[in-house]
Swiss-Prot record:
Regulatory domain, as annotated region: 379-502
Biological source species: Buchnera aphidicola subsp. Uroleucon sonchi
Localization (cell): Cytoplasm
Keyword terms, alphabetized: Amino-acid biosynthesis, Branched-chain amino acid biosynthesis, Cytoplasm, Leucine biosynthesis, Manganese, Metal-binding, Plasmid, Transferase
Protein name listed in UniProt: 2-isopropylmalate synthase
Keyword Transcription regulation attributed: no
GO molecular function terms noted in the UniProt entry: 2-isopropylmalate synthase activity; metal ion binding
Lineage: Bacteria, Pseudomonadati, Pseudomonadota, Gammaproteobacteria, Enterobacterales
Length: 502
């Protein structure tokens, strides 16, 4: 279902990679494709079913013989698997889409379930558009299908129309009115058109549902599906209220989210609950001080519980002395090594000018002469690149290093940006490892600027760099120059500290 949100279909290899991540995270059941839809989807379901051992594989099928047979064939190498058949049950869908009455719908559903049971004893049935289906009809079809051997009854809010107390009432009614309901697991499948997918899912499990269908990061058609990571952590954090648990390895949540975001080319919003970059980030000085004293003051869950290493305090003009002091202590400096009052004044000036300040900026403010700090040691005087499709890229750069000028060239098969970075590295000889490269368009049309943000690793420390220009090659070069100057400042700090100790 999540793949419906993507502009292009995923390859078999990409789907398998996602499936392996989900398996490692401890997902109970993964619905991995719709085999009848294309040969590629059939191959994906087949490949995943052959490689996944610890999660149950499920395949989707309409109430059509060929769909069901194809689903069974795709998973025939599995010892255990599930076939998930679905059919619309709302009056609107029956009349305008299927052109059938409810008795015909029941007959189709029963026939399809019996067909699926030829391949596996684990059959799930979805009453498509269940949230807009009359309660009488819903109870009637659910009872008949459970009698046929359906193990899981799914109640989808197909168009994201319902609200939490309404879905809760639907589930409660099923438990009260369907006599054989205890023979099947009740599932919910919510969409996020009104922004209530997670809330609806939680209300459903409070009413008795025991399976939640969703996607990591909430990706899916239209406004998306239930974000599984949000439901999972809600169940964990509010176990006192819900009294439930899952089999999920919570420490794999963040990594799985990042992998899926990258493969699907769908960036995670910074304010996304649980996995967004700001989810455990604190900028306010009051909040930062509170978190440093006791993280529970402003955090309801431990970042490490989803696989993050530690709290992230953003150093901005809103940060207080406590945050600045915390970063200096994290870098190994004692209070006696610097003047916190002077440092904080200089920090605020830099934060107003720069926006976000990093640990190495604090070092420079504390230990480098202010006039010296304002000077950029490295300055790009000239660059040229030549790149031919399906061939090597060549770059030549002229770099001002203090009062000396150096020129260097480089040739690589990895493109013009890599060629420029190699040429710069030949001049500076800094053993840099590029960890992240991100290009963002600023503005529109021919005058748009390309902002390049990079993250590099140098001797166990991370350094950020930003470049902005209409030419993305130039902005890439500027970002690396930014990094080189930050590294140089750290080297100057170390040099000055050594001189002080002599």
């Amino acid at each position: 279902d999540g793949e419906q949100a993507l502009q292009a279909s995923l390859s078999v290899k990409e789907k398998l990679q996602i499936a392996l991540c989900l398996e490692k995270a401890g997902v109970d059941i993964m619905e991995v494709g719709f085999p009848i839809s294309s040969p590629g989807d059939f191959k994906s379901v087949q490949t995943i079913s052959q490689n996944i051992k610890n999660s149950r594989i499920c395949s989707l099928a309409r109430c059509i013989e060929k769909d069901i047979d194809t689903a069974g064939e795709a998973m025939s190498h599995c010892d255990f698997f599930r076939i998930h058949v679905f059919l619309a049950t709302s009056t609107l869908h029956m009349e305008s889409k299927l052109r059938k009455n409810f008795d015909e719908i029941i007959d189709m559903a029963i026939f399809s379930v019996k067909r699926a049971l030829r391949y596996t004893d684990d059959v799930e049935f979805s009453c498509e558009d269940a949230s807009r289906t009359t309660m009488d009809n819903l109870c009637r079809i659910v009872e008949k299908l459970i009698s046929c051997g359906v193990k899981t009854i799914n109640i989808p809010d197909t168009v994201g129309y319902t609200i939490p107390n309404e879905l809760s009432l639907i589930i409660k009614n099923l438990f009260e009115r369907v006599p054989n309901i205890h023979k099947s697991t009740i599932s919910v499948h919510c969409h996020n058109d009104l922004g209530m997918a997670v809330g609806n899912s939680i209300s459903a499990i409070q009413a008795g549902a025991r399976q939640i269908e969703g996607t990591i990061n909430g990706i899916g058609e239209r406004a998306g599906n239930t974000a599984l990571e949000e439901v999972i952590m809600a169940i964990k954090v509010r176990e006192d209220i819900l009294g439930l648990s899952t089999n999920i390895n919570h420490k794999e949540i963040y990594r799985t989210s990042q992998v899926i975001s990258r493969i699907c080319n769908m960036p995670i919003p910074s304010n996304k609950a649980i996995v967004g970059s700001n989810a455990f980030s604190h900028s306010s000085g009051i909040h930062q001080d509170g978190v440093l004293k006791n993280r529970e003051n402003y955090e309801i869950m431990d970042p490490s519980s989803i696989g993050l290493k530690k709290v992230k305090l953003n150093l901005t003009s809103r940060s207080g002395r406590a945050a600045v002091k915390y970063y200096m202590n994290e870098m190994g400096y004692k209070d006696s090594d610097y003047n916190i009052d002077e440092l904080y004044v200089d920090f605020l000036k830099l934060a107003d000018k720069k926006g976000q300040v990093f640990d190495y900026d604090l070092e420079a403010l504390a230990f480098i002469n202010k006039k010296q700090d304002e000077l950029e040691h490295f300055c790009l005087k000239f660059f040229s690149v030549q790149s031919i499709s399906n061939n090597l890229s060549t770059a030549s750069v002229t770099l001002l290093c203090g009062d000396k000028i150096y020129t260097e060239s480089s040739t690589t098969s990895n493109g013009p940006v890599x060629a420029i970075y190699q040429a710069l590295n030949r001049i500076t000889h800094f053993p840099i490892i590029l960890q992240k490269f991100q290009l963002i368009a600023k503005g529109q049309g021919k005058d748009a600027l390309g902002q390049v943000d990079i993250l590099v690793k140098y001797k166990k420390r991370q350094f950020h760099g930003v470049g902005l220009a209409t030419d993305i090659i130039e902005s890439s070069a500027q970002a690396m120059i930014n990094v080189l100057n930050n590294i140089w400042k750290v080297k100057q700090v170390n040099k000055n500290l050594k001189n002080l100790k002599k």
